[in-house]
Amino acid sequence: MDERFEIKDIVAREVIDSRGNPTVEVEVITKGNGYGSAIVPSGASTGTHEALELRDKEKRFGGKGVLMAVENVNSIIRPEILGYDARMQREIDTIMIELDGTPNKSRLGANAILAVSLAVAKAAAATAKIPLYKYLGGFNSYVMPVPMMNVINGGKHAGNDLDLQEFMIMPVGATSISEAVRMGSEVYHVLKNVILEKYGKNAVNVGDEGGFAPPLKTSREALDLLTESVKKAGYEDEVVFALDAAASEFYKDGYYYVEGKKLTREELLDYYKALVDEYPIVSIEDPFHEEDFEGFAMITKELDIQIVGDDLFVTNVERLRKGIEMKAANALLLKVNQIGTLSEAVDAAQLAFRNGYGVVVSHRSGETEDTTIADLSVALNSGQIKTGAPARGERTAKYNQLIRIEQELGLSKYAGRNFRCPF
């Protein structure tokens, strides 16, 4: 073993995320003075099958404190992995999974395990003196992802009457990530002015992910605002739309409650079909309830667009395998904190790619200044990244990191219209 990579110290602490809720930060230091730090995010609409964040459930922070998770890193995980070579990512992740011993990482907490997992990778990259994306992906990592920018919020992310959770723009006609960010930012500013004119200044406050939450009632109203803004910005041919329905949130007792109507699965499919016919929608995430593999298979067959599984798959290899067998969805939303280790997240991405599925590397609604997912999207050549509107520091941190990576790479390829299969 090259002793420069030996893990010399691990320190965990409680910090806060973009919603002011506590989360876990971990620092890993190697003997070669490689330093890696990671802060984990958390979601608002979470899948039932996600790995579990450990919360203290005491008075501090309204029960959301993470001191138990921090203590688990410092007193249980740390002694077990001190002295390990930081490049032994899979072995270290496996040790933590076995130490936890539960199927959903509920004993030590997925927030504790993931923070260590990511910090180890960063410390190894720093010791090797190479960027994280190159350390994780090697020299074949050169595809810059198309951003899915969540510019209008509904559902659990907003206080309006929109049932669908996210209305996103994708600058597929750009030629680079820096141009894509510029296009997205320009559309975002036009959208702000359009909303301001129609609904007044109270309608342009931003939500958790930097998007606006105007007082809208229907998806068509939101999509009309996007259409008008894209046209005014001059990007009709370059910018397309994506939706995150987060349908588990409006599903109850076998029915979907959308825009005041009680819909069956088939009626909801017709609703999506009509939207896709009317607007340039190229991707829909979680169109049905998280257990409705058949519904996902049906919409994937019926609509010639990207269908993304988030709550359906929760970045879990077993659930993804089931989806692949049933031809349910054709893309995976990759959230490292849904599964809890870097190794397992990469396994899920590789399984998706091998079976012709797209991969969208994603943030959470409760984010931090950590930029790991930007590097991960390039490392995997995922072709797509979902990291919010071009606003709020915890979102723009990822875009700025992608711009840095693009400049550093020199010869990179922007995924563009081939976002689902960039090769």
UniProtKB/Swiss-Prot annotation:
CDD domains: enolase. It is found in: Cytoplasm; Secreted; Cell surface. Mg(2+) binds at D244, E285, D310. The keyword Metal-binding applies. Pathway: Carbohydrate degradation; glycolysis; pyruvate from D-glyceraldehyde 3-phosphate: step 4/5. One of its GO terms (cellular component) is phosphopyruvate hydratase complex. The active site is at E209 (proton donor), K335 (proton acceptor). (2R)-2-phosphoglycerate binds at Q165, K335, R364, S365, K386. Coiled coil: none annotated. GO terms for molecular function: magnesium ion binding; phosphopyruvate hydratase activity. GO terms for biological process: glycolytic process. It catalyses: (2R)-2-phosphoglycerate = phosphoenolpyruvate + H2O. Its cofactor is Mg(2+). Keywords: Cytoplasm, Glycolysis, Lyase, Magnesium, Metal-binding, Secreted. Binds a second Mg(2+) ion via substrate during catalysis. The covalent binding to the substrate causes inactivation of the enzyme, and possibly serves as a signal for the export of the protein. Catalyzes the reversible conversion of 2-phosphoglycerate (2-PG) into phosphoenolpyruvate (PEP). It is essential for the degradation of carbohydrates via glycolysis. Homooctamer formed by a tetramer of dimers. Belongs to the enolase family. This is Enolase. It comes from Methanocaldococcus jannaschii (strain ATCC 43067 / DSM 2661 / JAL-1 / JCM 10045 / NBRC 100440) (Methanococcus jannaschii). The lineage of its organism: Archaea, Methanobacteriati, Methanobacteriota, Methanomada group, Methanococci. The gene is eno.
